[in-house]
Structures are given as structure tokens and as C-alpha cells.
């Protein structure tokens, strides 16, 4: 039996991403070096310092003992990618961080943080747009797998199932938002994407 493609529903709005409902997961793109030093990543670091500590330790662990995998994408008409390549973890993966008590105690909502490792580096070391989109495709598949595992567990650990996101990859990584949005749509995800209010 043939399956028809599933397209997600992306709702775009203006406001503050950090006003997402309690229990929601906030998605953003990350480098693999353990740095949330600029842009929206710095805002995540300021709001969720305990989550940042987990992200940084995850990166440092993989930087200290290298682990690689070969990715063989299946090119399609609209794909920017198509060549197999060797990637060093955590590139092309997702890190799902549960709410940390220090981050929400007495002042913040309980948010899950989802890091999509879409660029190996940052600044001058940022990956090319084609590599970032390929890594986004891989990381979104990994994120979906981890979310499915959460849903299979009793109680979901406070995860509401709601996915919220910034226009990831489009800031300091310099990738056209429409390309990242298409990855989310093609993955069949429902995501609320929040951009800062103009003015």
C-alpha cells in the first residue's frame, strides 16, 4: 500500500518564543562546539542556564572522543544535497533536554529545549547552507524519534507535545528560512514558529 506524503502544519506568529505554553518544547539550531554565544542562542543561554550546561557537556564529551557516521541522503527534485559524507557527532542529531528545575524555579515556565545540531561550527566556521539543510533533515528525524520515545513512556515527563520554534538557521547561520520550514513541513510536524515583533 503506497503512502502519500504527510505535510506538517507550520503556524507563524510574532511575539516572544519564551512565552510558549508550560510543557512546550522550544526548538533551535545549534553549533557542535558547545557555544550559545550570540543571537537567539544567547537568549536561550540567559533564560535556561542549566539546559545550556547540559548542551555544553554533551558537545564537550563528543569533542573529546570523536565519533563519526556516514550519511547517505536520497536526493529529490528540491533537495540541495545528495552526496554521502562523513559527519562527526553530534552534527545532524538532536538533543532533547527536559525542563531543569534551576531554569524554571519560581520564575519561568517549564520548557523542554530541543537542540538541532545543524552546523559544525559558528562564526567563520559555520557550515555551508547545503550542509546545514542536510543536517537539519537528519536532526529533525532524530528529534521525531526521541519525541516518539517520550510519547511511549508513561506520563511524558511533563512534555505537552507542543513544538515551538524560532526561525532557526536563518539568523547567524544565514540560511533562507523557507528551506528550514520545508524540512519541518516534509517531516509532518506541527510547529508554532515565533518571530520577534517588528518595531
From Swiss-Prot:
GO MF entries: phosphoprotein phosphatase activity
Keywords recorded for this protein, A-Z: Hydrolase, Protein phosphatase
UniProt entry tagged with the keyword Oxidoreductase: no
Similarity annotation: Belongs to the POA1 family.
EC number: 3.1.3.84
Role, per record: Highly specific phosphatase involved in the metabolism of ADP-ribose 1''-phosphate (Appr1p) which is produced as a consequence of tRNA splicing.
Organism listed in the record: Aspergillus clavatus (strain ATCC 1007 / CBS 513.65 / DSM 816 / NCTC 3887 / NRRL 1 / QM 1276 / 107)
Binding site for substrate: 15-17, 29-31, 36-41, 168-174
Pfam short name (any one): Macro
Any single biological process term in GO: peptidyl-glutamate ADP-deribosylation
Residue span(s) of domain Macro: 1-199
Catalysed conversion reaction: ADP-alpha-D-ribose 1''-phosphate + H2O = ADP-D-ribose + phosphate
InterPro entries hit by this protein: ADP-ribose_metab_enzymes, Macro_dom, Macro_dom-like
Gene from which this protein is expressed: poa1
Cross-referenced Gene3D superfamilies: Leucine Aminopeptidase, subunit E, domain 1
Name assigned to this protein: ADP-ribose 1''-phosphate phosphatase
